[in-house]
Amino acid sequence: MRVRISEIFTSIEGEGVYIGTKTLFVRLAGCPLRCYYCDTPYALSMSDGREYGVEEAFQIIKESLNTNTFKVNFTGGEPLLQHLALYELAELIKKRLGPRIYLESSCFDSDRFLYLLPLLDICKVEFKLGDALAVDHMHHHILLDNALKCLRYAIDMDKITYIKVVVGISSSEDELGILIRRIFEDMNIDKDDIKGFILQPVHGKGEPTLNKMLKFYDIIYPYYEDVRIIPQLHKVMGIP
């Protein structure tokens, strides 16, 4: 089995509930989405990066893994594009190294997500709002439905799970409200089922105002009081 990787590096987690933790990032190449705020365009194509055998990639990860690393973060690109190779790689890490396995994904394919889930410790389930332009308007509901299924799968398998929504200048309050009701009312997700709910403001282009971020916060708070507005720390610090 071969896997295409854009980069492997150690830094601090710059997003989400584990912000500030020492992390080994494994960025897989290829992504089917085209979000306007994407900050890793060099990893969008399946021809980006370098191809490795799974065992070869594992050895590089092993040599790159520093002491006291909190987790190995599989990111992209979109890791689910290479789910078969990722499964083998994650299995080797679990058996031979033992750090927490974290998946950072758009959750565009719930079947691939479910395939990987037994090997995951931490799942970030990201919901793309329509203004992200991740997919065309006609297919956006499919993307959301898959992410909702992934959320349910992760919770049912008792994984550490949190939700992230990226907010831009054109993000819709009504759309977020519908999404929140689907999560907490229609799906009956309990607040204790998830580790956190992160609102992440877009950085660099189409940035939302503070007032907009607070309005989004207010939509979520009645359902989930531990909602947090957290920008990308690594962008603020100027690190990878």
Which positions does each model-derived feature cover?
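Conserved AdoMet/S-adenosylmethionine-binding subsite of the radical SAM
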Residues: 81-227, 232-240
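Canonical Radical SAM [4Fe-4S] cluster-binding loop centered on the CxxxCxxC motif
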Residues: 3-56
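Short, basic/glycine-rich phosphate-binding loops at helix/coil junctions
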Residues: 36-41, 68-69, 128-131
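Glycine/small-residue-rich loop that forms an oxyanion/phosphate-binding "nest" at active or ligand-binding sites
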Residues: 47-76, 80-84
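Structured loop/turn residues at beta-strand edges in well-structured enzyme cores
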Residues: 3, 33, 67, 118, ...
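Short, conserved beta-strand segments within well-ordered enzyme catalytic domains
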Residues: 25-27, 71-73, 102
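Ser/Thr-centric signal marking residues that sit
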Residues: 40, 75, 105
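Generic structural signal for well-ordered alpha-helical scaffold segments
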Residues: 13, 58-63, 152, 181-185
